[in-house]
Amino acid sequence: LVPRAIEVRGVKVKVEQIDIPVSYAAAFEGERVRREDMHVQFGGKYSRAFELVKTAEGEITDGQVQLVGPDIDSVKAGEAMDLGVVVEVSGRKMQSDFEGILERQIHRYLNHAMGVMHTGQRHQVWTRISKATFAAGFRLRHFGTILHAKFHEDYGQIVDKVQVTIYTRPADIEKLLPQALARYDARDARMSGMTDESVNTFYSCTICQSYAPNHCCVITPERLG
């Protein structure tokens, strides 16, 4: 009843504190986890891994995080596991064009957790969790906790519900990875057909100002920056 009332009235969820057993801050972005300090890793050249954000096709439960398969306490330190992170989102203003934008934020959100190293996106990700972070009690479900909180915090205007399912069984990855690749290809095909003349909005990016203070990129369909 309460979730339905929140949805009908348009009440926005805000998570005041992310419930994970390690510190969480932007200061940890770019932290490297070396092999000798690593408990487990996913993707890269060591295993299969992918991340996918998609608009929910049916009813979802906000805040639900489900792990399908073994957790990271089932492997010995230094081993690799398959990983699939599927984030389903819904909202009155949510559009399929936003999926790729939200998906790219997974890199930043996971990197802000102490002892978590994340690079890449889509099916070209590489993630490591340190021994210290594992010893503190960090588990795969905490990936979902982070994503739920941050999507609501940063994209609350378009996202009403966030549900995360994490897969680690090789059989599930074998089945789901081709589906994810098909979605990536569909997005790329849609983008490749766009031209500067076909849109009425261009965007600017100032991320480079961290090392080039006078720099600003103008982003268009034919000029990506």
Task: Give the role of each language-model region.
Residues 1-225:
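Cysteine-centered metal-binding/redox modules
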